[in-house]
């Protein structure tokens, strides 16, 4: 059992503008407040894969397995040879849009149900919500300002700063 964590943001931009930035190779370099670097491994019609290095040096690999042009995508993220978490990015709306990110974090999911529930409730969920809200604010900030988001723009994060 893996409990999801989900956050979304309303954007005063149409879905095409939002899709253009979230589907751009290396876009985390411009939009992600905790990204040190986002390097592309593959980025073509059928294959999308990149590497995200956080400000604190953690390196995670993102492998996109579902690409729904103009609407969103699904990917697995994790250390190169480690367990992966599932992430779903979804755009809804037309002239004004909503960007939603849902993460199914693998961390501590191998614990018994009670331990996992407690860890998820008091550690994973609040930490991931803070992280996801900062990431979403980064996209909004980039779309409004058309400049790269300053690092830790919305506050530091104990897992990634």
Residue ranges: model-predicted function:
Residues 1-43, 160-161:
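Hydrophobic ligand-binding cavity/cleft-lining segments
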Residues 79-134, 141, 150-152:
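Beta-strand/loop substructures that line and gate deep hydrophobic ligand-binding cavities in soluble
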Residues 17-22, 28, 64, 75, ...:
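Hydrophobic pocket/interface hotspot
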Residues 60-67, 71-83:
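Helix-adjacent hinge/juxtasegments
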Residues 12-16, 65-70, 90-100, 145:
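A short, structured loop/turn motif at beta-sheet edges
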Residues 4-6, 57-62, 83-88:
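Short, surface-exposed coil-to-beta transition loops
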Residues 48-55, 74-80:
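Short beta-strand segments that buttress and anchor functional surface loops
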Residues 149-161:
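Charge-rich (especially acidic), low-complexity segments
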